[in-house]
Amino acid sequence: MTILQSPCAHDAELYLLFAKGKRPDRLAIKAFADRLPYLAVTHDPAHDDAASDEPAGDGGGAGQHNWLELLRDGLTFDLVGIAPGPAATFPQVSHRFDLPVLPDAQDYEALTLRPGPHIASAGSSMPLTRSLLALASDFVRQFDDLAAVVWRPAESAIGRRFFESATSAWLDGGPFPALGLTAFVQTADGALESVGLSFWIGQELRIEPPLCADRVAATRLGIRLVNHLVLAGGLSQDDRIAAADGTRLALRPSRNRALISVWRE
């Protein structure tokens, strides 16, 4: 296996969903940063009226001052949508984890958290993305009204406890949180395909039928394979691995390298 670079630089962002009327204001964010020795607010546009400093989109705009720049691990991140200004544009959500229903704009308001413009070109680099997710976990631990995190590359909404536990375990050396940072969908022909894996490795995963006849078992296999592929950085040529039951599985990238197919030999 060789490392393949992901092309999805613009997707390196997430959304923090708060109960209606519970978004934090700039004072709450500054107090939050003051409690963590590794976190700082490095720019507040309320103290600088230069319109050019305002981030575009996501509810940000000249004169609104509804954002702050945060510094963590030597990297800057923009937090957009703080109260009392307008919330960030509510994200597209297609998958849910540890949530009873898909969240929507009727019940929640969003803040966007993303790499600052000076480092956004780093895209899906692992150090940058890990710091972004670690910062989101900090928010979950500090704000009780934060109900869920939406990971944009997978269009997945993740309940606060599941997000924090799975992400923290990965950051501490555990398995990649495939349920949440990726998702799985069943195709019309009965295969199981990943959603959002291309952010991490530039490729999606397809588990071919009949290997995915048992959806639960296929999802477990998908979780294992996603962890394997993220660790490896992608797949550039045919490979074989052993399944949990000892049978051999074949992995093959498509001609354009965009899809990795898996089947039992």
Task: Give names to the regions the model predicted.
Residues 35-43, 133-148, 230-237:
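Structural alpha-beta junctions
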Residues 26, 30, 126, 130-133, ...:
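Short, well-ordered alpha-helical segments
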Residues 75-176:
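Internal, hydrophobic cores of structured domains that mediate oligomerization or house catalytic pockets
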Residues 4-5, 101-112, 191-201:
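Short, compositionally biased low-complexity segments
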Residues 92, 151-265:
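Aromatic/basic-lined ligand-recognition segments
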Residues 17, 120-128, 210-217:
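Conserved aromatic-histidine-acidic binding/catalytic patches
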